[in-house]
Design a protein with these regions (language model features):
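Thiamine diphosphate
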Residues: 1-152, 274-293, 297-301, 363-525
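Long, well-ordered, tryptophan-enriched scaffold segments
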Residues: 3, 188-404
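Conserved alpha/beta enzyme-core scaffolds, especially Rossmann-like or related mixed alpha/beta domains
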Residues: 33-37, 46-49, 153-157, 184-188, ...
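Short beta-strand segments
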Residues: 73, 99, 156-157, 183-187, ...
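Short glycine-/polar-rich loops that comprise or flank the Walker A/P-loop
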Residues: 151, 178-182, 214, 501-502
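A short alpha/beta connector and helix-capping loop motif
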Residues: 164-189, 520-523
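Conserved strand-to-helix beginnings and helix N-cap segments that scaffold or border functional pockets
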Residues: 164-168, 196-199, 516-517
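Anion (oxyanion) recognition and catalysis
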Residues: 175-176, 210, 310, 496, ...
Length: 525
């Protein structure tokens, strides 16, 4: 009997190597072949792209459906474009335009890239948070306008992005709690721009996520290593790997097989030496570098496990190799490194391509071509419209016999809008714990505060009716200007990401506006 699952993942293995080739070659062409008048390095991130090839292959070519939305790690833009090209969503002519005017952008852009980008990324930390607030927006839309087809909101996160404070502000906010359709996949390659990160902060980060109510999966080992752990001596092997410093383990990736044996077994217990005594250098090197973030089946299983968590967000820490599959793998200075022309030639031969067919898609009748075409159909989305067929009043009937502040006028206008039956359903307000002091109180009295579930009001206030339930139209945030602008951006994009146009209005005091502008820019860029 043919194992269809094994056959499918074998095909995906083949596809991911073509994805890696195209991503690396796009960057190589931009730097070495495209006319360059001033001779300045164009740049690109071949190593950072390589580390996410497996997880993006498993996502786009196996796991996602057409309603899902994904934020792609900024430096992985070439991988995204390679996958879109193989699925037929990007014309071949664009592959040689990376980082050129009018061409493929350095980082995914909703407005400037020709292929279907869901979230603009680039300013680290904002990409992961955007899908989180998009999911909060979908929850609001479903409560007010009826359930849409189920959608998952996913972010590919660079591990260094977890140094950004806005990440932790976003996951801790009450407005983002209980979102079971959110999954973050952390590219846990343990390297930053400048260095191999000393130590591993996974325990600290895991604690933060779990404290915020998230489901956490640590995908550290691939199938081969997990199988080895079950063999005699496997416990000693696992303990040795777990106890090894991050710096020592990272140093294995760029070594020849014989050097891997020597470095890995340095000061190792006798039981570990015995475990590898009957294994040649190539087998050993292949085994000890078998990380979960490059095991397509393990990734697919982890994604399914996250889907089963219906009442809380999930994060997968996928251990990867920065520069996976490339000569620069694991090099502490590989962040902006580029393969040499000779290495590109070697890579081309390794993936069985020539200069004549190096940019080709798979043949339509091949197993790989069939998968790519099928996935294009699965992921296809019809266009949506931002148009709202309503008439916005040009003025409201506010009269005053004495001067009033602009803030008071704003509050009175909002109350009048709440009386407009055609306009009111689409208006949603939000504020970072300053709703009443910015004169949203009158509006809130009329429309209520949004909560996924009805909440009992324990203390009656004769002036302010803080009534919380699924039909409320004000979303209250904690004191975080970054969260305010992230949410406003996703509410504004709800016409595309949730199929429902909204009219979002946010309030904050002017000294704090600048703190959130970066998030606002990336919502409209």
């Amino acid at each position: 009997m043919i194992d269809e699952s094994a056959e499918e993942f074998s095909t995906l293995e083949s596809i991911q190597h073509r994805v890696l080739w195209l991503a690396v070659r796009m960057i190589d062409h931009a730097n070495n072949e495209r006319p360059n008048v001033d001779g300045v390095k164009v740049g690109g991130h071949q190593a950072s792209s390589a580390s996410v090839v497996s997880m993006m292959t498993a996502l786009f070519l196996h796991h996602l459906n057409g309603h899902d939305r994904v934020a792609v790690k900024p430096h992985a833009a070439p991988v995204f474009h390679a996958i879109q090209y193989l699925m037929g969503n990007l014309d071949r002519s664009y592959l040689t335009t990376l980082r050129s005017k009018g061409g493929l952008q350095s980082y995914p852009s909703r407005t400037k890239d020709p292929d279907p980008v869901d979230f603009s990324t680039g300013s680290v930390g904002l990409g992961p948070a955007a899908p989180l607030f998009a999911a909060a927006t979908r929850r609001y839309v479903d409560a007010h306008f009826g359930d849409r087809p189920p959608a998952r909101y996913i972010a590919m996160v660079g591990d260094a992005e977890l140094d950004e404070g806005n990440i932790w502000e976003a996951i801790a906010d009450p407005a983002t709690q209980g979102l079971g359709n959110v999954m973050w996949v952390v590219d846990f390659n343990r390297q930053s721009l400048d260095r191999v990160v000393p130590g591993v902060r996974l325990e600290q980060w895991t604690g933060h996520f779990e404290s915020a109510g998230w489901h956490v999966i640590e995908l550290k080992y691939g199938k081969k290593l997990r199988g080895a752990f079950a063999m005699p001596g496997g416990d000693a092997l696992r303990s040795w790997i777990d106890e090894m410093s991050n710096e020592q383990y990272q140093s294995l990736f760029g070594l020849a097989p014989a050097e891997v044996r020597q470095r890995f077994l340095e000061n190792a217990p006798e039981a570990v030496h015995q475990f590898f005594s009957d294994m040649d250098d190539h087998q050993m090197a292949d085994l000890v570098k078998d990380l979960g973030g490059h095991d397509l089946e393990s990734l697919a299983d982890a994604f399914v496990a996250c889907d089963k968590e219906g009442d809380r967000p999930s994060v997968v820490f996928a251990y990867t190799i920065k520069g996976w599959g490339l000569p620069m793998a694991g090099n502490p200075r590989n962040h902006s490194a580029l393969l040499t022309p000779e290495q590109i030639d070697d890579f081309r031969r390794a993936v069985n391509l020539t200069q004549e067919d190096e940019w080709d898609r798979f043949d339509a009748g091949s197993a790989e071509g069939i998968v790519c075409n099928e996935r294009r159909e699965v992921l296809h989305r019809p266009p949506t419209s931002a148009h709202l067929d309503i008439e916005v009043p040009s003025q409201v009937g506010i009269r005053s016999t004495k001067p009033m502040s602009t803030q008071e006028a704003f509050g009175r206008i909002m109350v009048e809008l709440a009386r407009d039956d055609s306009l009111r359903p689409y208006v949603v307000t939000t504020a970072p714990d300053v709703a009443t002091s910015t004169n949203l109180g009158g509006f809130i009295n009329k429309v209520g505060v949004f909560s996924p579930v009805e909440k009992r009001l324990w203390s009656e206030d004769p002036v302010m009716k803080w009534s919380e339930g699924p039909q409320g139209q004000h979303i209250e945030l904690g004191i975080s200007e970054m969260n305010l602008f992230l949410l406003l951006g996703q509410l504004g994009l709800s016409w595309d990401l949730s199929g429902q146009p909204l009219i979002p209005i946010g309030t904050v005091y002017d000294p704090f506006v600048l703190r959130g502008l970066d998030a606002f820019i990336y919502s409209v860029y």
